[in-house]
């Protein structure tokens, strides 16, 4: 047993010695990418990503076929060790990304004690924020994963947890005054996301000194909650925010034709509308800018790692164009959501023209258990061209 422990320590030390210290240099200039959150690994995806010209992809692999209950984790109820079969599939995808010149941000939607809602019978799993034993399991999961992936050339960042929301677990929907009072009371408790992020960075750094780490903040990485985020003492950390919304405007099933950017933006959940300019949209990220200035976080350590607007809704092209302009003006990294998503959720597949519906052959293929991807009517359209232009090589 002692021999095995010493051998393991020696292996980790040797691996650390050959880990790539230059990975942070990737982020020293603005990077533009896309999200990939599919139900399986598809090698042809990376070929298409190369042809588009993506700098990087943010992969969320939780829905990939898992040997156990939860991909890579095994069982989010009680993590013990990385599942080797799942890890082999992930490495296969990373190899494919590298062959096509696409760098990878690896993101988990599930962690021990925080199983992704869509894989949990549509129930939010908040155990991570109420019991520190799950913190320890989450840290151990990422220690093991980082030790195995730190030398892979495709990996340019770990994003340990997508859209954390301990706030919601305790009944908060917005960073209001009641939340501010609660925030003060929960310091150094399991609900303290900032402490969780600090300890997560420390855990990863115990096995991997060099790979950048991207941290999501409160309220599903909301830009408006950035005043409650705290920086970590690590010069290879980036701070992420997601879609500025308003959510009820950009979401198809909620919008129902009521709202459109920039002329009919909701002032409240079901309230009246108002017109926005690009400057008004930029105000949604004011707390991000203030965080950057207050803590001396340079622009190349800020990342808008998800933004979207359902293609079927009026205003999608104007919204996406204005957000990209805002991010580019500030030299923030960004990744649109999403590129060539598989399955029947096609509202965020911008290569499909805004008014285009899926044909009968598409639905027939799904009914027959066949691959419907070749039947998606992707093609040139004004919305897609807004994104496509961003990846043209100068």
Language model regions located:
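Active-site region of glycoside hydrolase catalytic domains
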Residues: 118, 126-274, 283-310, 329-335
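Aromatic-lined substrate-binding rim segments of carbohydrate-active enzymes
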Residues: 44-116, 137, 193-208, 214, ...
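Surface-exposed, active-site-proximal loop segments in enzymatic domains
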Residues: 65-85, 112-132, 169-182, 347-354
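Boundary/entry segment of secreted carbohydrate-active catalytic domains
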Residues: 20-44
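Aromatic-rich peripheral "rim/lid" segments of glycoside hydrolase catalytic domains that contact
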Residues: 314-394
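N-terminal signal peptide c-region/cleavage motif recognized by signal peptidases
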Residues: 14-15
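Short, acidic/polar
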Residues: 38-51, 138-140, 285-288
């Amino acid at each position: 047993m002692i021999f095995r422990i010493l051998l393991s320590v020696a292996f980790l030390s040797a691996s650390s010695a050959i880990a790539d210290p230059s990975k942070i240099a990737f982020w020293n200039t603005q990077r533009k990418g896309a999200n990939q959150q599919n139900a399986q690994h598809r090698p042809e995806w990376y070929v298409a990503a190369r042809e588009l010209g993506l700098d990087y992809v943010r992969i969320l692999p939780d829905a990939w076929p898992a040997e156990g209950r939860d991909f890579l984790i095994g069982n989010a109820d009680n993590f013990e060790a990385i599942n080797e079969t799942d890890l082999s599939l992930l490495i296969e995808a990373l190899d494919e990304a590298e062959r096509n010149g696409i760098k990878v941000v690896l993101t988990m939607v599930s962690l021990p004690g925080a199983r992704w809602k869509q894989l949990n019978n549509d129930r939010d799993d908040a155990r991570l924020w109420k019991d520190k034993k799950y913190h320890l399991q989450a840290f151990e999961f990422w220690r093991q994963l980082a030790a195995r992936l730190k030398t892979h050339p495709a990996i340019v960042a770990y994003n340990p947890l997508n859209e954390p929301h301990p706030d919601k677990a305790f009944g908060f929907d917005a960073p209001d005054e009641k939340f501010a009072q609660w925030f003060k009371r929960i310091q150094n408790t399991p609900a303290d996301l900032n402490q969780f992020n600090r300890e997560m960075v420390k855990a990863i750094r115990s096995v991997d000194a060099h790979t950048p780490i991207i941290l999501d903040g409160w309220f599903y990485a909301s830009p408006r909650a950035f005043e409650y985020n705290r920086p970590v003492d690590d010069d290879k950390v980036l701070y992420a925010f997601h879609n500025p919304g308003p959510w009820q405007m950009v979401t198809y099933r909620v919008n129902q034709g009521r709202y459109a950017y920039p002329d009919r933006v909701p002032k409240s959940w079901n309230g009246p509308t108002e017109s926005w300019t690009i400057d008004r949209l930029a105000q949604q990220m004011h707390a991000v800018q203030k965080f950057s200035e207050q803590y001396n976080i340079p622009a190349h350590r800020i990342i808008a790692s998800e933004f979207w607007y359902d293609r079927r809704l009026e205003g999608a092209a104007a919204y996406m164009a204005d957000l990209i302009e805002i991010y580019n003006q500030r030299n923030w990294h960004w990744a649109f959501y999403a590129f060539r998503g598989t399955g029947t959720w096609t509202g965020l597949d911008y290569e499909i023209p805004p008014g285009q519906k899926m044909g009968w052959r598409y639905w027939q293929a799904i009914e027959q258990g066949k691959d419907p991807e070749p039947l998606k009517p992707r093609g040139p359209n004004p919305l897609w061209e807004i994104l496509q232009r961003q990846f043209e090589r100068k």
